[in-house]
UniProtKB/Swiss-Prot annotation:
This is HTH-type transcriptional regulator ArgP. NCBIfam families: argP, PRK03635.1, PRK13348.1. It comes from Escherichia fergusonii (strain ATCC 35469 / DSM 13698 / CCUG 18766 / IAM 14443 / JCM 21226 / LMG 7866 / NBRC 102419 / NCTC 12128 / CDC 0568-73). Residues 4-60 form the HTH lysR-type domain. Residues 21-40 bind DNA. Controls the transcription of genes involved in arginine and lysine metabolism. Keywords: DNA-binding, Transcription, Transcription regulation. Homodimer. CDD domains: PBP2_IciA_ArgP (cd08428). HAMAP family: HTH_type_ArgP (MF_00513). It comes from the Bacteria.
Length: 297
């Protein structure tokens, strides 16, 4: 059985995390040549490339499996060392999360764990349709995703759903929808997406108004909080989680443009198996809080 030296795995991990050999060498306090030698040693052991040497480098499928193994080992080390970790460097916990969860329920859910445990969070923000891929690639140890199926050697639990409403300010609605929200009016009303792969508003408009993707003017803004600001200031109409704008809806600062219509996204919590003690704490915290504030029906 091939048993990699974890020093060599850490070199592979550093090249991916630091997006290059030079910064990886600085991170590990060794020469760039030494980093290359360690990765070459790993590749010789497995008889295949573990890195695609692009800019930035990315792991091959086998490289992804090895990085996932490293993540599990790091967490299990924490499990076995237990109280001996007290006073040492806090455990790094890398999680892939969607921006809307981060802007609404995720941080309150993690608050008890952060207050009670010596960990350093590394939250990698990605669309909920793509967070699971970060877990597959071994970049993180847990992911909030819309995918219900667990990856091999992983666990999954349902968190609950975010309900998205199509909203705007009242002045925006009066300007663009004086006769109500119609297909013709929507063609002129600007919307906003998180990135070029965010299809939330496109799916909603196509399903309910038969508007094909790309038919409405669209801003690109990588911030959930900015969606709320853009809607409040009358710049756009957009899809925002109801949980994020309860106060604005109650005060009338924002209005639901399409009462009775919404877009529901069920969220799931994925992580490696077996779980370490620390990951079990994270899982319990996310499930307990998620089941309180997210839709369960």
């Amino acid at each position: 059985m091939k048993r990699p030296d974890y020093r060599t795995l850490q070199a592979l991990d550093a090249v991916i995390r630091e997006r290059g050999f030079e910064r990886a060498a600085q991170k590990l306090c060794i020469t760039q040549s030494a980093v290359s030698q360690r990765i070459k040693q790993l590749e010789n052991m497995f008889g295949q490339p573990l890195l695609v040497r692009t800019v930035p480098p990315r792991p091959t499928e086998q490289g992804q499996k090895l990085l996932a193994l490293l993540r599990q080992v790091e967490l299990l080390e924490e499990e076995w060392l237990g109280d001996e970790q007290t006073g040492s460097t806090p455990l790094l916990l890398s999680l892939a999360v969607n921006a809307d969860s981060l802007a609404t329920w995720l941080l309150p859910a993690l608050a008890p764990v952060l207050a009670d445990s010596p960990i350093r969070l590394n939250l990698q923000v990605e669309d909920e349709t793509r967070t699971q891929e970060r877990l597959r690639r071994g970049e993180v140890v847990g992911a909030v995703s819309i995918q219900p199926q667990a990856l091999p050697s992983c666990l999954v639990d349902k968190l609950g759903a975010l309900d998205y409403l199509f909203v705007s300010s009242k002045p925006f609605a009066e300007k663009y929808f004086p006769n109500g929200v119609t297909r013709a009016a929507l063609l002129k009303a600007p919307v906003v997406a998180f990135d070029h792969l965010d299809d939330m508003h496109q799916a909603f408009l196509q399903q309910n108004f038969d508007l094909p993707p790309g038919s409405v003017p669209c801003h690109i803004v990588n911030s959930s909080e900015a969606f709320v600001q853009l809607a409040r200031q009358g710049t756009t109409c957009c899809m925002i989680p109801h949980l994020q704008i309860e106060k604005e809806l109650a005060s009338g600062e924002l209005i639901n443009l399409t009462p009775g219509l919404l877009q529901r996204r069920m969220l799931y919590w994925h992580r490696f198996a077996p779980e370490s003690r620390m990951m079990r704490k994270v899982t319990d915290a996310l499930l307990e809080y998620g089941h309180k504030v997210l839709r369960q029906d």
